[in-house]
Amino acid sequence: MLFRSQQSTSAILPIDEAEPDYLLKIILIGDSGVGKTNLLSQFISHQFSDDTKTTIGVEFATKSLNINGKMVKAQIWDTAGQERYRSITSAYYKGANGAMILYDITSSISFNSVSKWLQELRESTDPNIAIMLVGNKNDQEELRSVKLEEGKNLAEGNRLMFLETSAKEAKNVEEAFHELINSIVECYTKNGITGKEIKRNNIQGTAVKKEEKSCC
């Protein structure tokens, strides 16, 4: 289930009976129509809709995962891609532990916008935030306008993780989220960053400082 919010205030989520080791904030960004809502819906509830409405403001959902023996609750924010909602959505970048930047492989315009989204993300969050570039809708191969190699090269040039997905066919959806979340947990575990540190920084709207504890 997705919960809609058009306000720029922090949302308080219900806590599961078992307190997670890590409560992570993940944001999905990219142009309108690239499939962010369906990607999230497929990951959370294994559902896809051809009639998904354009996201207004911000929606979020949560999912609990076991990552290498760690209980992780991922709080995933689906942001609007339209310019008129930018002031609302950018407010939710603060305190993010990871991000996915989506483009549509059938739309070179959405691919060309990736650099803009990446710049905005890095200006609003910790510059070392874990980021995955996702080329969505690769079930529409006959309409492809962005080559696989173009996505790979852009990701490599900006030190991003990369996968192509199909929210419609559930291809690489689980893999994309798990790879991103796993990379965050591995980084925090390696550097001794605790769930309490992350929770405190998320409440304050800041990322865990990585000058001393860098994942790069």
Indicate residue ranges for each PLM-predicted region.
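Post-Walker A alpha-helix
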Residues: 40-41
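Conserved catalytic network of the ASCE P-loop NTPase/AAA+ motor domain
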Residues: 66-69, 90-95, 122-127
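Conserved P-loop small GTPase signature centered on TRAFAC-class small GTPases
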Residues: 1-33, 37, 67-71, 127-216
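Switch I (effector-binding) loop of TRAFAC-class P-loop GTPase G-domains
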Residues: 45-71
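WD40-repeat beta-propellers
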Residues: 75-77, 103, 117
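Switch II (G3) loop of P-loop NTPases
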Residues: 72-85
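Conserved Switch II/interswitch segment of TRAFAC-class P-loop GTPases
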Residues: 96-115, 125-128, 138-145, 170
